[in-house]
C-alpha cells in the first residue's frame, strides 16, 4: 500500500510539474511574441542624433518648434511581420510609394517638414496585430491615436510634425492609454 501511495504521489507531482512547465512556457512564448517597433526621426537642426526609440516612446521634440523631416521604422521579433509607411511632405504632398522596414520616408537636407503620416503592417502575421501611432503637431500638441493606415497629422493645414509615438499591439487591443508625452532626449 505504501509503495502504491508513493507511486501515486510521484505521478501527481510529475503531472503538476509538467503542467506548470507547459503553462509557463506557453505564457512566456505568447508574451514574447508581441513584436517590437523601433523608429527614429530626422529633426530640424538635430539630424538623426536622437537615435532609435521603441514601443511607444516619443521620438522628436515637443515645445522646441523643430520640424520632423524624415522617419525610419522597423519591426523586430517576428520574421513574418513587416511595416510600411509614407509621409505627407511640405510643398510635395503625399509620397507616391510606401517606405518599408527601416527605409527612409521624408527628406534630409531639403528643409521640408513632415505634415502627416500613414503606417500599416505587412506580412503573413499582419492580421494578428494593430499598429497605433500618434503625432505631436504644431499648434495642436498631441493628436489622437490613428491605426492601421489611417492618417495622423495635419495634411493640407501646413503644420509641422514635431514628435511621434508608435506601438504594435495584439489585434483588437484598445488604443494605448496616454503614454508619456515627453521626448527621449
Predicted regions and their residues:
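Bacterial N-terminal signal peptides that target proteins for export
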Residues: 1-12
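Sec-dependent signal peptide cleavage junction
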Residues: 19-34
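Lectin-type carbohydrate-recognition ectodomains
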Residues: 32-185
Amino acid at each position: 500500500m505504501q509503495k502504491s501511495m508513493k507511486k501515486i504521489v510521484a505521478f501527481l507531482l510529475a503531472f503538476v510539474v509538467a503542467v506548470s512547465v507547459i503553462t509557463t512556457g506557453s505564457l512566456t512564448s505568447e508574451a514574447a511574441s508581441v513584436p517590437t517597433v523601433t523608429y527614429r526621426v530626422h529633426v530640424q537642426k538635430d539630424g538623426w542624433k536622437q537615435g532609435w526609440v521603441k514601443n511607444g516612446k516619443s521620438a522628436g521634440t515637443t515645445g522646441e518648434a523643430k520640424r520632423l523631416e524624415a522617419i525610419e521604422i522597423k519591426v523586430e521579433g517576428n520574421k513574418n511581420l513587416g511595416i510600411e509607411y509614407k509621409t505627407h511632405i511640405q510643398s510635395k504632398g503625399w509620397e507616391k510609394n510606401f517606405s518599408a522596414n527601416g527605409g527612409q520616408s521624408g527628406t534630409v537636407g531639403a528643409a521640408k517638414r513632415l505634415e502627416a503620416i500613414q503606417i500599416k503592417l505587412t506580412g503573413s502575421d499582419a492580421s494578428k496585430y494593430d499598429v497605433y501611432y500618434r503625432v505631436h503637431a504644431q499648434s495642436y500638441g498631441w493628436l489622437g491615436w490613428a491605426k492601421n493606415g489611417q492618417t495622423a497629422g495635419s495634411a493640407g493645414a501646413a503644420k509641422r510634425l514635431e514628435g511621434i509615438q508608435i506601438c504594435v499591439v495584439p489585434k483588437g487591443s484598445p488604443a494605448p492609454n496616454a503614454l508619456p508625452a515627453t521626448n527621449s532626449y
